């Protein structure tokens, strides 16, 4: 007591030193060792091994358990003869490189026996008191095609240098990984295929948690047939993975930022499923580019200098008394990691630190004669301006916007009900600002937003006047970029849902404006009507049986015969038909064509590539009294239909 009374400062110092030392004693220093084949990083909580030949994560141990599906030798070491790192077309999924541990689809090896990767220590724990270790496995393309994983040819797939990093910090329950891609100016044209990090997990993982509606017991013998029923919106699930009901441990991939992920806030993707080979290992997947649901792309022209850093993201391992507790902890950890972003330990000129980034804010003001009130689910983003994608010998241009872009970075935020928004941690660059919200057809754009390091931007009030082609006569649905509001959309994961349409609507859909309810009377898939009692669903392929043409009939009343031009406007969020015919009162009025196929129906989705289409017709086709408008999907395989987000009829009588 006398010490505290007379020397309060010394007392404070004493306890600060005591608790600091106590904390240090709880968290051992990070160590880094190596042999001919691997680096081993250890912090007393986790031990990870990285293959020098490829950058594959061949082992991750936690609580003295191997967390990956790694084949082990009798002394519990990774069996790298049975499952060699890098290019390995003779693995369990034959014909492509696919391992039973953690790996990037585009590793640093490239085709086997072409050129060795360069392994190095980029952060040496001996030089920082054991606070952090980092290793690099770098592959120099020199014109080679790199990447031999799923979707790639055995001779490689993408011409780029690849630098794969793993970083382990003191006291961290997991390891970070990231990959730096660089296409040098002297390299030829190249096109990226499926691109992701995959972690295949130990057999004791039996509970998958990738979304609040997809959080369930998933043992090895639970054969779901089709992994596409487990796709989810990436941006809504930044922490996802598996836990074990027998070992009470978890493994989760945590994205602290979505800036390096393709497709923006509406992108649907695989996050987890069981492998399709006989081992059926639990998989956690971090796709940053894929072909799923319309996909995204990275095409790089000959002579183009392109660079991108994917990550760092965190491979988090934890424990708890139940899967729900383990999942809750992982989601809480995601918030912590997001607050840390960008990580100050990343030393790369192409990875701006916090002081080198900026904030962009503003307020959207909606000017619309019908839509009033607060913004609902307002999303605002800064992305690359729309661009022409490089193609070899292309007859037409392919323009890429944020939905299909994986080449550049994107920054999105959820705005407030009053239209205000703030996008933080933005890299320097030139961007287009996009915004969309529930209840409003279309999206807002503002071009030429130039972000400079450390210089906040206040865009002030931004007036948004949605496009209208005339007076609104009626509408169906809610413009929200998906079909969630329509009948049976909540059952999209039922692989046979397309077949059930014919039973639910034997006479097809008839929708009466002012009386019908789209949540009960509008089936969310407009598909060919099945007439084959033997028709069946096939995993990964959907339903190939041919159905007859299907009319959706909309009945509506008009007080007088109209004049002028009518515009039938569509927001489309899933397409696999070639066209949709439009009839008004039994007469042809036009056709929806030039559609964007995205496989949403065969892959059990309710949203893919979103776009607008319209059909203009002479208003004289309509009359006083009751009118009939038909949308007709042609005879075709039952997969070949349409999913609407929203439909609106407008009349310009000027």
Where are these regions (language model features)?
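Extended, loop-rich substrate-binding clefts of extracytoplasmic carbohydrate-active enzymes
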Residues: 92-181
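A contiguous, surface-exposed recognition patch within enzymatic or periplasmic domains that forms
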Residues: 197-308
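A short, amphipathic beta-strand motif
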Residues: 358-369, 419, 462
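Short, acidic Ser/Thr/Gly-rich low-complexity loop/linker segments typical of extracellular
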Residues: 388-420
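Beta-strand-rich ligand-recognition modules
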Residues: 415-418, 545-563, 571-653
């Amino acid at each position: 007591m006398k010490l505290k009374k007379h020397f309060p400062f010394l007392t404070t110092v004493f306890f600060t030193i005591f608790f600091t030392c106590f904390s240090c004693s709880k968290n051992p220093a990070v160590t880094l060792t190596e042999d001919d084949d691997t680096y081993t990083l250890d912090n007393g909580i986790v031990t990870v091994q990285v293959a020098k030949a490829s950058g594959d994560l061949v082992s991750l141990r936690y609580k003295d358990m191997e967390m990956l599906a790694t084949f082990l030798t009798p002394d519990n070491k990774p069996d790298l003869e049975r499952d060699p790192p890098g290019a390995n077309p003779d693995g369990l999924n034959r014909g492509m490189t696919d391992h039973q541990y953690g790996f990037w689809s585009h590793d640093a090896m490239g085709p086997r026996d072409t050129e060795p990767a360069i392994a190095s220590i980029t952060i040496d724990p001996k030089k920082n008191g054991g606070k952090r270790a980092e290793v690099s496995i770098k592959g120099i393309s020199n014109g080679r095609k790199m990447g031999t994983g799923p979707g790639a040819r055995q001779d490689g797939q993408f011409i780029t240098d690849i630098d794969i990093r793993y970083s382990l910090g003191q006291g961290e329950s997991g390891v970070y990984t990231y990959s730096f891609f660089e296409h040098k100016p002297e390299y030829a044209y190249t096109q990226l295929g499926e691109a992701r990090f995959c972690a295949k997990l130990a057999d004791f993982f039996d509970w998958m948690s990738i979304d609040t509606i997809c959080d369930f017991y998933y043992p090895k013998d639970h054969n779901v047939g089709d992994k596409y029923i487990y796709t989810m919106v990436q941006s809504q699930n930044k922490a996802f993975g598996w836990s074990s009901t027998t070992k009470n441990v978890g493994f989760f991939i945590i994205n602290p930022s979505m800036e390096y992920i393709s497709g923006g806030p509406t992108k649907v993707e695989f996050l987890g499923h069981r492998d399709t080979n006989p081992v059926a290992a639990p998989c956690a997947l971090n796709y940053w580019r894929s072909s799923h649901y319309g996909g995204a792309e990275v095409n790089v022209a000959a002579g183009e200098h392109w660079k991108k850093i994917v990550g760092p993201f965190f491979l988090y391992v934890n424990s708890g008394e139940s899967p729900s507790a383990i999942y809750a902890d992982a989601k809480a950890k995601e918030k912590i990691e997001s607050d840390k972003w960008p990580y100050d330990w990343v030393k790369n000129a192409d990875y701006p630190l916090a002081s080198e980034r900026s904030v962009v804010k503003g307020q959207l003001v909606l000017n619309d004669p019908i839509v009033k009130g607060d913004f609902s689910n307002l999303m605002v983003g800064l992305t690359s301006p729309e661009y022409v994608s490089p193609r070899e010998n292309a007859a037409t241009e392919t323009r890429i916007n944020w939905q299909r872009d994986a080449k550049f970075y994107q920054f999105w935020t959820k705005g407030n009900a009053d239209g205000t928004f703030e996008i933080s941690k933005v890299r320097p660059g030139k961007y287009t600002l996009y915004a969309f919200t529930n209840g409003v057809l279309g999206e807002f754009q503002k071009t030429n937003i130039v972000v400079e390091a450390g210089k906040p931007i206040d865009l002030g009030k931004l007036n948004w006047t949605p496009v209208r082609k005339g007076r609104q006569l009626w509408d169906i649905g809610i413009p929200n970029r998906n079909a969630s509001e329509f009948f049976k959309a909540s059952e999209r994961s039922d692989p046979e849902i397309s077949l059930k349409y014919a039973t639910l609507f034997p006479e097809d859909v008839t929708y009466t404006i002012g009386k019908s309810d789209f949540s009960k009377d509008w089936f969310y898939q407009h598909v060919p009507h099945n007439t084959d009692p033997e028709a069946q669903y096939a995993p990964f392929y959907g339903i190939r049986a041919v159905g007859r043409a299907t009319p959706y009939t909309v009945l509506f009343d008009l007080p007088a015969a109209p004049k002028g031009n009518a515009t039938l406007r569509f927001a489309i969020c899933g397409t696999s038909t070639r066209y949709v015919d439009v009839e008004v009162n039994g007469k042809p009025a036009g056709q929806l064509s030039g559609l964007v196929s995205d496989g949403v129906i065969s892959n059990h989705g309710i949203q893919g590539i979103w776009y607008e289409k319209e059909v203009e017709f002479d208003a004289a086709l309509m009359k006083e009294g009751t009118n009939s408008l038909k949308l007709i999907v042609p005879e075709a395989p039952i997969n070949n239909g349409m999913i609407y987000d929203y439909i609106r009829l407008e009349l310009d009588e000027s």
